[in-house]
């Protein structure tokens, strides 16, 4: 029986390899395998959108904000990964459709007994095709389409709400009531679609971008919706505790903005078996992952990269092809922009740009852009007039064009609420004086010191802390380079981050910018025990941010926070990724019941 089943699987896989039929319209994708979908966090019922009611300031003695009721097994820590996010979007779409059906008196089919998926498409194909109409765009940038009887969802990449499309089903997750598909053909395009906006020859196959066919203002609206859903799905808070999400701040550059690319490749087994000096080795694909497949696409150019990074990508591809023997199993490459500003003179003004140096003349200096490929090399970035040196392989924001607006927003919200657009001068002045006692800045997860340094002029004293000693070394050097006074950095123990902080909590602003996984329980407990007056939570994953903010709003031992504002920032145009800043203020302390 086992051998028979194995032979059937091999035959099916052979058909699977042959099913790469070109589409006749718009976008073509190939069939592929996909990774197992991870566990989803389960939220009872549908959701209401944040901002429908004004965020309440619960100041009554002993009164704690109410969270959504959840089953015991549903309290496990959400990870905010792509699979988890898609599953929640699918779950909510199905529940909303079920609710509408019941309101209209329609009979609903149980997803567990439905046969709507099994018999669709070509019966002799292991990967059936079907026609769907997309209902909405998921938080991961994929279209979600309901089955005819509304009990199942098809996840369709590169498709937009309202579009009718032919898709190929390659995996069905019956317990979660959805299927993963390839887009074969767009039969009826949405009015929102504008394929003339697409600037990449690999779009529709490469997994890097999802939204190139959407006008930029529509991308920003979609990213605002992503944040709204993140707080509805992951925070566990009632809608009235979540303020209206602010409009997403756009990037000045929608292409040519990425200062770092990390293409990768796998050495073919044939090359590893060859003896040194034998036949010419096979050049593997060097680039990024194909959408939905565990396979690298050969990417010759990426229009998201800056000019010097794109030049560096081409040079690195050529270098690797000529030196494959140095990579017995493949590798991940680094191409990172570095900037040097030199005083203008006749000599450097006359120097031309090359494929390794791009020179631009400004009134006061000549800017030289180069690229770094050494993970341990030092890259140089300028944010406003501040200079930052970083170890090239470590984290630093990859979109320099939006950084001045982003850091300006953080600075404007460090001490007081952002004034309303229609505020009178008196109201603006009152808002500016709302937190006169804040004197100190504490920057956790400080990295190379971005926020500590940029915000230093606003506070009497600033301190950046991080568990990575190498980051602290860079931060100290950066403070010296920018001649920033009253600023210090310290390597801290993760188990006692706030133990030796010299600042009184009631006079301190805490800025946190954790990695994608967000803050762990230990850190959040330490934060609540320290209890700073104001918290600015900067996040590259709005789902884990929403989860963590929910914990801070719920509070512990009489310390909790209210959400003042939430706003997204588009660091990665053309993708579904959005970053967010949540501003929290400490509520009046209450006694735990």
Residue ranges and their predicted role:
Residues 1-42:
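N-terminal mitochondrial targeting presequence
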Residues 39-68, 74-110, 122-123, 139, ...:
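Rossmann-like S-adenosyl-L-methionine
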Residues 50, 62, 72, 76-126, ...:
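Terminal, basic amphipathic appendages of nucleotide-handling enzymes
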Residues 130-136, 163-174, 331-337:
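Flexible glycine-rich surface loops and low-complexity tracts that mediate binding to linear polymers
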Residues 134-148:
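Short, basic/aromatic beta-hairpin or loop at an interaction surface
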Residues 143-147, 167-169, 181:
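SH3/SH3-like beta-barrel fold
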Residues 187-198, 204-321:
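Extended interfacial segments that mediate partner engagement and assembly in macromolecular machines
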């Amino acid at each position: 029986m086992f051998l028979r089943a194995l032979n059937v699987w091999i035959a099916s896989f052979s058909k699977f390899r042959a099913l790469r039929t070109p589409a006749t319209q718009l976008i073509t994708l190939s069939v592929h395998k996909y990774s197992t979908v991870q566990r989803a966090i389960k939220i009872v019922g549908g959701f209401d959108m944040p901002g429908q009611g004004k965020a309440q300031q619960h100041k009554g003695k002993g009164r704690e904000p109410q969270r959504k009721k959840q089953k015991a097994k549903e309290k496990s820590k959400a990870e905010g990964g792509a699979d988890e996010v898609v599953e929640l979007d699918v779950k909510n779409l199905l529940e909303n459709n079920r609710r509408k059906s019941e309101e209209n008196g329609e009979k609903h089919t149980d997803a567990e007994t439905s046969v709507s998926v099994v018999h669709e498409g070509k019966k002799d194909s292991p990967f059936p095709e079907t026609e769907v109409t997309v209902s909405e765009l998921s938080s991961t940038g994929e279209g979600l389409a309901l089955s005819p009887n509304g009990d199942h969802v098809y996840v369709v990449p590169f498709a937009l709400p309202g579009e009718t499309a032919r898709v190929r089903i390659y995996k069905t997750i019956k317990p979660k009531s959805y299927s993963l598909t390839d887009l074969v053909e767009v039969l009826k395009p949405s009015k929102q679609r504008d394929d003339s906006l697409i600037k990449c020859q690999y779009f529709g196959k490469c997994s890097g971008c999802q939204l190139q066919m959407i006008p930029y203002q529509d991308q920003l609206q979609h990213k605002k919706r992503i944040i709204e859903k993140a707080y509805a799905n992951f925070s566990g808070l009632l809608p009235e505790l979540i303020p209206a999400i602010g409009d997403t701040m756009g990037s000045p550059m929608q292409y040519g903005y990425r200062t770092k690319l990390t293409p990768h490749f796998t050495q073919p087994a044939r090359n590893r078996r060859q003896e040194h000096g034998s036949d010419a080795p096979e050049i593997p694909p060097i680039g990024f992952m194909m959408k939905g497949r565990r396979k690298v696409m050969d990417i010759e150019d990426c229009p998201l990269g800056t000019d010097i990074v794109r030049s560096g990508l081409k040079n690195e591809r050529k270098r690797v092809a000529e030196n494959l023997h140095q990579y017995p199993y493949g590798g991940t490459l680094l191409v990172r922009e570095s900037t040097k500003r030199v005083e203008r003179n006749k000599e450097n003004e006359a120097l031309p740009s090359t494929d390794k140096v791009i020179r631009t003349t400004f009134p006061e200096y000549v800017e030289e852009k180069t690229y770094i490929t050494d993970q341990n090399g030092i890259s140089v970035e300028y944010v406003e007039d501040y200079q930052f040196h970083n170890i090239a392989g470590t984290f630093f924001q990859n979109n320099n064009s939006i950084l001045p607006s982003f850091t300006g927003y953080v600075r404007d919200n460090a001490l007081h609420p952002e004034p309303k657009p229609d505020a009178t001068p008196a109201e603006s002045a009152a808002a500016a004086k709302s937190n006169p006692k804040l004197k100190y800045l504490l920057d956790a997860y400080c990295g190379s010191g971005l926020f500590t340094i940029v915000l230093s002029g606003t506070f009497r004293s600033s301190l950046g802390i991080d568990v990575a000693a190498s980051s602290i070394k860079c931060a100290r050097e950066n403070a010296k380079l920018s001649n920033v006074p009253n600023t210090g950095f310290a390597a801290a123990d993760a188990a006692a981050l706030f133990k030796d902080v010299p600042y009184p909590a009631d006079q301190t602003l805490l800025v946190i910018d954790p990695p994608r996984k967000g803050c762990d329980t230990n850190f959040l407990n330490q934060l609540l025990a320290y209890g700073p007056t104001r918290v600015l939570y900067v996040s590259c994953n709005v789902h884990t941010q929403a989860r963590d903010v929910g914990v801070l709003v719920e509070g512990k031992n009489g310390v909790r926070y209210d959400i003042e504002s939430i706003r997204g920032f588009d660091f990665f145009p053309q993708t579904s990724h959005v970053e967010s800043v949540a501003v929290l203020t400490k509520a009046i302390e209450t006694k735990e019941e």
